[in-house]
Amino acid sequence: MKRKLIFLLCLLLLCFASAAAAQNLEKLGSTTSGDLYIDKDNIQPLTHDGRLFLLVQAELHYNEETLPKLQSLRPELRTAVEVTQIYMYNNDGTQYALLKSLYTDKDDQVVYSVDGTPELNPVQSRLQMLLYEKALSQLEEQKRIADMLKRKY
């Protein structure tokens, strides 16, 4: 049941991502593989069994050094230039799960898909923590704007 719920939420998040004409990406930093971006329009809170989680969509745009290595791993990845990943963080951001990875080509067509697992792992890198912090800040900003729009003048 938990897997089905998470799968449905991932699909929902991906639908929102596909529907957006222009993504609202913010660069978080660089890795040895490329540049990591957060999609500020695809952040969703989730409550399951009384626990709060945060779904976040991020993109890794591969650099020129990593692309040939990536593309040689599998025939399906020959044209891949970036990967869109959906993460699920626990309430305090100390644990995360990688739920889905979608490898896309230069035309944003999915060329390869990898399902993750809802198993939570400890956050171990600065960029993983920064991804959670930026997502939380964006969620707070969205709430603040929604509250402002609700006010009657």
Locate predicted features.
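N-terminal secretory-pathway/extracellular module detecting exported/lumenal segments
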Residues: A20-T84, Y89-Y153
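N-terminal signal peptide c-region/cleavage motif recognized by signal peptidases
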Residues: C15-S18
